């Protein structure tokens, strides 16, 4: 969605698109080595499907949410470099045959893909249902269509709490703290002392990104 702003007639690289609080120049600073798949234009296209993301609350809260999302994306993708999960040995483990819909794309088809590394057959089913795309039968769309890839990450961020007690979106807009976003995304593996180095990686990137956007990181950064 584009918004006409009379005081911002120029959509140059320093101007946020629409009402997104991160400009393309800032995005490129965050992801200097990114794969072209993770484009700013694909992200801003995906945002139209999630109108509450980084638009809720004060300017500081909006920037904190954008920074938190992009910091987690940076961690999950190695700085926007990796589109698919690098450990191929894990690929067959993401099929939960206990689900009534099974794994129609194959047992090894539901590996991590995209900005937040969507994995498991049930997550592909739920994301696809929400986005109106059959990701259960065609999970490869998440590694081939960059807008769909960004949408799956935003879907997870705004609707899924994982092992946590709230979604990452709720954690940021209600100022519960960045640590809750880590728990929602990968709490089983990283939180409660399981992998402090991974947690620190996410926190450090979040602190860098909030500084870049000119806001404070807030409290409760760890999980």
Residue ranges and their predicted role:
Residues 11-16:
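Extracellular fibronectin type III
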